[in-house]
Amino acid sequence: MHKSVNVTYYLLSLLLLFTIASNCSGQSVDTKEFLPANDSLKGKLLFVTECHEVRTNYSEYQSVISKITANFTASDTLNIFLEAPFTLSHFINQYISGKNRILIDSILRNDPYKIEFYFSIKKLKKNIRFIAVDFEYDQGNPGGRFESYKLYFEELKNVLANSNIDLSVIKSFIYGIKVQGLEETDFYTFKKYIQKLSVNQSDPILKNKLKESNFVLAALQTREKPDVRDKAYYNRMQELLNAGISIAENMNLMIFGSAHGNPYNEKCLYHKLNYADDSPFKNKVKIFANVYISCLSYGSYNAKSIVLETVGLYYGSKEDKQILDLVLKNYKPEIENSFTIVRNTFQSDLKDVDKVLYWGIHYKVK
């Protein structure tokens, strides 16, 4: 019985990957100008600005990560900071290290493009660590944040069970996640419970898990304004890095939506990372700015699909049209459904264009 189910699952997985490959085969991807080995990026941060839900984004990131890690030795690590909750990065890291398949079997089961992306990262077999500290739970709205949050506390329940701790409190909390919905007082009460369990805890596995859970519960639980989210992300990222994540000797990549990367917005994440006195990346941020020319953006971030005509770096600002005209003046895309990396040689008085290493040009992507 189990063998039959496993064979069926394997065949369905192959069919899924074949379907994705067929859908992506029409894409033209040109990354020959991306030469990370020549850019002295170790200890710096390559900040990638994106507009969400464009099909070539995943082809881009797969190519970029493959090139960055191509000559890695066993002592090298790539840190990838995502616009995502900690609980999602927790399961991403488990999957790419071969520990379990919760990421693709549950959290991303309806998103074949992301499944293919993480499958390709796993196949690289390199030291890659995903780091994410954005808001969690999202008030129970359907999607990856809700799913990863729910599964994270199911995992905590199993850890508590292995330590013979009464499960009534955590079962009630999980019920609230799944069915009832959680209020601010629920988070506060459960966080106090976790802190109480941590006192004088001698089991190192349980102690570390409780500490991690406390960090998860301290996150924003709703989609706040970008400046509120960015401040929280920056502070929580600092907390993780101070706990022992090395960046100075490693390569560091950050992939974030354009609203968080505008150099003219002093409250955005990019500005904090490159200019704040307490930033570990102060004056060490390089920009990889994505450009979208007549590209379709799907799904979850928009009420409906929209066509993008923008440079992600200045999206939504008055500078966007100026930088888009500059890009098109210097580079004329010809192949539809294409992505091309172009090394920045453009001259402009717009802020921080001189910090752009690469333009990632997406052209007529459907």
Predicted regions and their residues:
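Compositional signal for N-terminal targeting/processing segments
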Residues: 24-366
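Bacterial Sec-dependent N-terminal signal peptides
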Residues: 1-34
